[in-house]
Amino acid sequence: MKPDLTGTRVVLRTIGPQDAADLFEIYGNPLTMEFASDPCFTSPTMVAQLMASVVRLEQTGESLEWAIVERKGNKVIGTCGLHSFSEAGHSCEVGCLLNAAYWRRGFMSEALGLLFAHATTLGVTCLTADIDADNVRSIALFEKLGFKAHAERYQRMLPFV
């Protein structure tokens, strides 16, 4: 079981059934989903499918996914995770999504800092982010966090300091 990761303003914790409404608010928002690899959700059924997929991928070791919870209101404001692990487990991709209502307030920077620190405990030494070329906000965030453009993707070596 993966641990909860606690920061100053956010907690990363396992996604659960109680999060369905907050997740639909995130994944059903066209602005939030503009550059996401998944289509914008149109029904709560799609959230249930997402949650089932998260459980299945975690059970097979293919992915680790957390809900990003704002501590102040105990609301799920996003998700982040690690996936596409290399054979040796030393590299993987990082993915994240934040409710547009919480953009540009430092929540994702804090969440990713917690995630990257945890990744080092798993033996991960290289993270990759696959970011759409038009997603200037995400590019700026990942560059701020030390990622460098590399073959149309962004990479960062760990540890994260």
Task: Indicate residue ranges for each PLM-predicted region.
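Short, P/G- and charge-enriched loop/turn segments at secondary-structure junctions
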Residues: 1, 53-55
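Conserved GNAT-fold acetyl-CoA-binding loop/helix
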Residues: 31-53, 64
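Acyl-donor (CoA/ACP) binding surface of acyl/acetyltransferases
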Residues: 1-34, 65-161
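Short loop/turn motifs at secondary-structure junctions and domain boundaries
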Residues: 56-61
